[in-house]
């Protein structure tokens, strides 16, 4: 909208230079002021929009912190780029989505309304290949045991 505002004063200057067209200038002035008033409304709404943006500001849940912690446990001297971190975050989201979907299907097949650790475990065995599934199941079992004991 700023480029339009710059164009309008440029149009007014030639009209001001011609004294013969003062009446037409006076007639055009209110017409030009009305769009300006219209422009002020979106600016005010924009200011209100900023408040709404502040209110709508939600924290985006990512696994970046946890990926970094695991990386430092495995390789303390190695870093990770932000692009690689984004890829890892997308990868984890994708795997969790697949596990949730498979768990949901298993619960529906067995006509059960809840997804239990058993459905999750079976979904892990179905989604992840071979040795990776075995390690995931053992780590998951260990985590559930630790959670229930504390």
UniProtKB/Swiss-Prot annotation:
Residues 1-58 are annotated as: Disordered. It is found in: Nucleus; Chromosome. The modification N6,N6-dimethyllysine is found at residue 13. One of its GO terms (molecular function) is protein heterodimerization activity. There is a cross-link at residue 146 (Glycyl lysine isopeptide (Lys-Gly) (interchain with G-Cter in ubiquitin)). It comes from the Eukaryota. Can be acetylated to form H2BK6ac, H2BK11ac, H2BK22ac, H2BK27ac H2BK33ac and H2BK34ac. InterPro entries: Histone-fold, Histone_H2A/H2B/H3, Histone_H2B, HISTONE_H2B_site. Its main location: nucleus. The modification N,N,N-trimethylalanine is found at residue 2. GO terms for cellular component: chloroplast stroma; chloroplast thylakoid; cytosol; nucleolus; nucleosome. SMART domains: H2B. Residues 1-35 have a biased composition (Basic and acidic residues). Keywords: Acetylation, Chromosome, DNA-binding, Isopeptide bond, Methylation, Nucleosome core, Nucleus, Ubl conjugation. The modification N6-acetyllysine is found at residues 7, 12, 28, 33, 39-40. Gene3D superfamilies: Histone, subunit A. The nucleosome is a histone octamer containing two molecules each of H2A, H2B, H3 and H4 assembled in one H3-H4 heterotetramer and two H2A-H2B heterodimers. The octamer wraps approximately 147 bp of DNA. Belongs to the histone H2B family. Core component of nucleosome. Nucleosomes wrap and compact DNA into chromatin, limiting DNA accessibility to the cellular machineries which require DNA as a template. Histones thereby play a central role in transcription regulation, DNA repair, DNA replication and chromosomal stability. DNA accessibility is regulated via a complex set of post-translational modifications of histones, also called histone code, and nucleosome remodeling. This is Histone H2B.6. It comes from Arabidopsis thaliana (Mouse-ear cress). The gene is H2B.
